[in-house]
A protein has these predicted regions:
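Bacterial Sec-dependent N-terminal signal peptides
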Residues: 1-25
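Glycine/tyrosine- and acidic-biased, solvent-exposed loop/turn segments at the edges of beta-strands
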Residues: 17-154
Length: 154
């Protein structure tokens, strides 16, 4: 009997609760578990397309995004992967086309653009390269055409 109770307890400790958009109230950028907006939600959050395919998934801590935030195309392929810390952008933001190819890469630090930003064509050619430091333009910015010819350098 004790082994069954121990196994059940271990299973329940590992279980994670998930809510969907209709289960939460969004107010001023924070998700709550009730209409009185007194209890910020902590846990996994998901949204689905009308056909049941996963649209997005993220973890909320005290009602705000925390960690990895993934957005999907209706086909089920990943469209974007973002990183949050205490409800603000922090880390990489990757964007993919419907074929799964990386077409955008951006960096944030504590909610501000910080680091390299790159955009590629669907053919994989680099189109733009930009740099930011603490939200402000920095370094040399470049752009190329679809064939890889340099168009501008500032």
């Amino acid at each position: 009997m004790n082994k069954k109770l121990l196994l059940f307890s271990a299973f329940m400790a590992g279980a994670s609760w998930t809510v969907q958009a209709q289960d939460l109230v969004l107010s001023e950028g924070q998700y709550y578990t009730d209409a009185t907006q007194t209890t910020p939600y902590t846990g996994r959050y998901t949204e689905f397309y009308d056909d049941g395919m996963l649209k997005m998934e993220l973890y909320l801590k005290d009602g705000r995004p925390e960690g990895t935030y993934v957005i999907y195309y209706p086909s089920g392929k990943i469209a974007e992967v973002r990183s949050y810390y205490h409800g603000i952008f922090h880390g990489e933001w990757r964007t993919y086309n419907e074929n799964g190819q990386l077409i955008g890469l951006a960096s944030y630090k504590e909610g501000q653009k910080d680091g390299p930003w790159r955009i590629w064509s669907d053919k994989g050619n680099l189109l733009y390269e930009m740099f930011y430091t603490a939200g402000k333009k920095s370094g040399v910015w470049r752009s190329w055409d679809e064939e890889g010819n340099l168009l501008s350098e500032e």
